[in-house]
């Protein structure tokens, strides 16, 4: 990652920058992540607070295993962090394909990470991003039971304590369509719970 500041003013304990720029270029396995971000910056070294009042940029993620191969996400929003108090607040907006997404995150502890969030998506067609199901095999292969699915690995979120709400205006999964979907999500102790609070089915589904 590369970070640059321009238009820096202020005293030793408090400074402002007209523009902070961040460039990211990372790779893990087959996944590559490239991005850039720009924002004014306000920092108080004595109080250990940092604020990016208005950032914008984009994030590009590519992996040959993804149905779309690569995804470009425009980003806008703002961030404020209190390093000493271990709190932060983030609001961000992006667009993934035909989905407009707005997120709010409030962090109450950095380590181990604890946060609450709200995620609002206007519409999402999950079927569009899933790989096609293989055609049924013929003859003896057709009579064989399908291989057991591997259990999901939640070890990466073992130390995470998070809760929040996901709202989706229009959702399609396995050709089932629903509107005004509201989900409650909780992650703690390496477990992930997703509970539907409400949803309206439509189009005869």
How does the language model describe each region?
Residues 4-88, 97-195, 199-204:
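Membrane-proximal interfacial segments on either side of biological membranes
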């Amino acid at each position: 990652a590369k970070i640059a500041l321009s238009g820096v003013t202020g005293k030793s304990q408090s400074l402002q920058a007209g523009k902070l720029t961040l460039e990211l270029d990372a790779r893990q396995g087959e996944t590559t992540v490239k991005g850039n971000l720009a924002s004014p910056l306000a920092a108080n070294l004595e109080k250990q607070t940092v604020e990016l009042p208005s950032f914008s940029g984009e994030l590009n993620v590519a992996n040959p295993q993804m149905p779309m191969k690569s995804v470009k996400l425009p980003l806008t929003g703002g961030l404020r962090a209190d390093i000493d108090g271990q709190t932060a607040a983030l609001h961000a907006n992006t667009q993934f394909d035909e989905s407009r997404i707005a997120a709010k995150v409030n962090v109450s502890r950095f380590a181990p990470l604890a946060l609450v969030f709200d995620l609002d998506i206007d519409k999402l067609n999950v079927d569009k991003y899933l790989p096609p199901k293989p055609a049924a095999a013929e003859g003896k292969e057709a009579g064989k039971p399908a291989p057991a699915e591997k259990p999901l690995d939640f070890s990466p979120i073992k130390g995470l304590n998070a809760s929040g709400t996901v709202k989706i205006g229009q959702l399609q999964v396995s050709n089932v369509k629903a509107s005004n979907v509201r989900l409650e999500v909780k992650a703690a102790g390496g477990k992930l719970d997703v509970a539907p609070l409400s949803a309206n089915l439509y189009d005869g589904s």
